[in-house]
Amino acid sequence: MAIQITITVKDKKKKSSAGEKLFTRKPNAKGKHLIIVESPAKAKTIERILGSDYKVLASMGHLRDLPQRTLGVDVENDFKPEYVNSAERADVIENLQKEANKSKDILLATDPDREGEAISWHLSKLLDVDPRSNTRIAFHEITPPAIKEAVLHPEPIDLNRVDAQQARRVLDRLVGYKLSPWLWKQVYRGLSAGRVQSVATRLICEREEEIRAFKPVEYWTVEGIYRTEEKESFKAKLTQVDGKEAKINNAEEADRVVRGILKQPAEITSVTKTKKQRKAKPPYTTSTMQQDAVNRLNFGSKKTMALAQMLYEGIEIPGHGHVGLITYMRTDSTRISDEMIKQVRPYIERVYGKDYLPPKPNVYARGKDSQDAHEAIRPTNLQFAPDMLAAVLSRDQLRLYTLIWNRFLASQMAPQISQATNAVLQSGIYTLRATGTQVLFDGFTVLRTVKEKKQDNEELPLLPALHKGHTVLNTKAEGEQHFTAPPPRYTEASLIKTLEEKGIGRPSTYAPILDTIQRRKYVEKEGKQFVPTDIGFKVTDLLKKYFAGIVSVDFTAQLETWLDKIADGKATYKKVMSGFWDVFEKELQNANLEAAKTKEENQEVSDVICEKCGAHMIVKMSRYGKYLACPNFPSCKNIKPYHTGEEKEEISDVDCDKCGAKMVYRQGPYGRYLKCPECGQNKAIVIDTGIECPKCHEGHLVKRRSKRGRYFYGCSRYPACDMAVWDEPVNEFCSVCGAIKVKKVRKNKEEELICSNPECTTHPKKKTVTKTSAAKKKTTTAKKTTAGAAGKTKTGAGD
């Protein structure tokens, strides 16, 4: 059932939720101009461009956010957020405030999107800067012209965009904070739900249900091989039988058709030749870049965005300093600036020739939901061709940069021109068609490799010279069996495409959505494909039953539209939040009532008898999947692995260390493990993270257990590669040193992504312990190895 938010905007003068206060900061006429950005890499690039009159500092991201342990939203007071300063970045805040007091003026140069606008607004609050003053500068590429132009034209912070980001943050907090405890009661403690992530999980679960319900249907195709008088052979495919579409359902029908075709030669009844133009695709948006990076480079969306961030913020190039190589990477626009069009057209003509330059620039249509606030993703300077940067960029950086470079150049090149030949053959009652393609002019495809052309099936075989009325001899005919296929499982590329098509999320949210549903164990990857877990199905079923409106695809897309309207000043924060809350609060109240009534009724009772107390055991769910538990808990705490009796014993490739037999997979209450069917030996499963080893680029990082029982993550090619880290790695890289990032769990159970390189300036430093007892502790013998994203520094692990 589609839920609608009804919002009437009557007042044209809308007051922002950002609020106002009296600002007292006094500028220091003798100080420098202070510019604040998010990252040290970006700061370094901009400071090189502007020179010694400017000081550029990094905020290291958000310095204020909603509190971790409370809701942090005053629902009764117009949904006012209650922000707190980041305790872990207290030193950053202190330093920025100190430098602000010494500065002549302050320019906030955070990213040119809603998230960046919100960071600038939070900085204005911390630094006592009036957000309505000309303090905000924005640019879409980090190049000298763009930076200098931005500095000359500062503007007030766009409070509408701040409100739009604030609305997204508060919506997600309300859903997560209210839904998660409800899920704990229904399934198990520790589960969490998200507004957009739940919809993405739903799409994957519903696709899996379609696949499971699908029943394949057999069909056959028939192909004949013919020879001309000049003894040249070609293939033709059966299209019609007795003037009707050919439908062959089984082997017997296929054999009958094959025999019929072989009885006589065929006459060529028509030959048509058609010239076709194939135009290049538009330059990359965030979505299309992520899709191509998955399909062509085998990069995950998180890794793609991390690499793109590095290319945008700047790379040290000998003789040129720190250079931003691409435009801003979070965009839904395919637009190219007039200045870059003036540069790329002469470049194409000079490098590839006049024939490859179209008469006028190629212009691409806007997407229906495109905000068109930024340009497309493109190189910033055509001086830096990929082959010039091979010694400067890491392997993965270069691969992504080359992808962006080629896509941009191709988008402004002439189309490919080909000639398609279609010949129709008649053999008795059987009609066959032969097709061939000849490329007359390669156009933009001159940039594509042979491998890429094969991936896209661009080249079809040529046909020999064929003439109407001529007879050709049949040398062979054969049938081929096929079965209709179910819809494919989602990959990262296809899920991102679907989310974009359905209006769910925006360029900045695709990668976090995919990362979140995997971290929460709602879906897993088999190869490149997403497969929902038991817990993913369970949570999705519950949310669809009790929160049909909130996890509706249409409702989620509608909310995105309202967030856009807030950013454009066409709706207010308060009204959108109220419209959402009216829907959500009703569903939450109903869910609490109904779920309490039906919880016991919904319990799945098994046929397995508890050997300790004689009760029928019930099927329960944990983060590791289904298991059997005694209903008389806590008086009886018996649990067992869950088996339906329908599972086939899954044999692994792992040999038992004791007897050499092939081990089989078993499911325990704490997850899957290996068991020898002969001698009973148990063994833990080595878990592949799917993340490419950043040191050797050949193996994957896998989860292992050290001799002392501690888990760590090392290269699957060990001992050939000794890359290892203690904490769980993610497909994201440090913007300062390029090392892989890892998840660090703090004492308050909160996760934080940190650089794994202890020598990096962003790596959290341990406080010095002065106690005598601490100094006497034995030092670890764990070997430490180093490897960055391009074979640089990494912290070792594994003893």
Protein language model features and the residues they cover:
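Basic, low-complexity terminal or inter-domain segments flanking catalytic cores
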Residues: 2-34, 44-47, 52-54, 126, ...
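Intrinsically disordered, low-complexity regulatory segments
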Residues: 2-169, 360, 460, 478
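Phosphate-backbone binding and catalysis cores of DNA-processing enzymes
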Residues: 27, 48, 95-273, 379-433, ...
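Conserved short loop/turn motifs at secondary-structure junctions
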Residues: 31, 111-113, 188-192, 273-282, ...
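Short acidic, hydrophobic short linear motifs in intrinsically disordered regions
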Residues: 268-271, 279-293, 320-329, 486-498
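Short, positively charged loop/turn segments that connect secondary-structure elements
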Residues: 294-304, 316-331, 486, 500-512
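Short, hydrophobic-biased segments on the C-terminal half of alpha helices
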Residues: 305-309, 514-515
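A short, conserved structural fragment
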Residues: 312-327, 520-529
